[in-house]
Design a protein with these regions (language model features):
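Alpha-helical transmembrane segments
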Residues: 11-15
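Internal alpha-helical transmembrane segments of multi-pass membrane proteins, especially GPCRs
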Residues: 6-10
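Positively charged n-region of N-terminal signal peptides that target proteins for export
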Residues: 1-4
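Active-site- and interface-proximal helix/loop "cap" or "latch" segments in soluble metabolic
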Residues: 26-152
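Bacterial signal peptide processing site
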Residues: 22-24
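C-terminal motif of bacterial Sec signal peptides marking the signal peptidase cleavage site
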Residues: 16-20
């Protein structure tokens, strides 16, 4: 319980600190060229590990990737059976909601403006947690993979 509260508070403070730095737009923050990755420490109960990878070129966001990988290195966004099952059950699937989350972030320039995607509530929270970590590293130039405690 203590761990959950600690993680929640850390996320809230990090979100506040990062969004405070960005003001209204991402591009108001000085970003260091490089590729920055944040990923969860553990695979989830379904065998996936979420990650975000941000690439900065000439001080600007060039690319943002949000996906999940299994122990064999397969991407969730490319798993056809997972897509079919999820789309039938909740009306969305990883490649679709990943793109939506990334576009919301890039268009608004603010993590706090990213809305929950229906059918992908957990993934939305995971995206927000991981993008905060990746963007913080992009401001400091730390290109080491940021390992983040899974949200429980």
């Amino acid at each position: 319980m203590k761990k959950i509260v600690s993680l929640a508070l850390t996320t809230v403070f990090a979100l506040g600190a990062f969004t405070g730095c960005t003001g209204e737009q991402i591009n108001s923050v000085a970003l260091t060229d490089g590729t920055y990755r944040a990923e969860f420490v553990e695979f989830d109960t379904n065998g996936w590990k979420d990650y975000v990878e941000v690439t900065v070129v000439e001080g600007q966001l060039d690319q943002v990737v949000f996906d999940s990988v299994d122990k064999k290195g397969n991407l969730k966004s490319e798993d056809a059976s997972y897509k079919a099952e999820m789309e039938q059950m909740v009306g969305t699937y990883p490649a679709k909601y990943n793109k939506d989350l990334i576009n919301q972030f890039l268009e608004s320039g603010k993590i706090t403006a990213v809305d929950i995607v229906a059918g992908a509530t957990e993934s939305t929270g995971n995206f927000k947690t991981l993008i905060i970590e990746a963007m913080e590293n992009a401001t400091t130039g730390n290109t080491e993979v940021e390992i983040v405690e899974n949200i429980k």
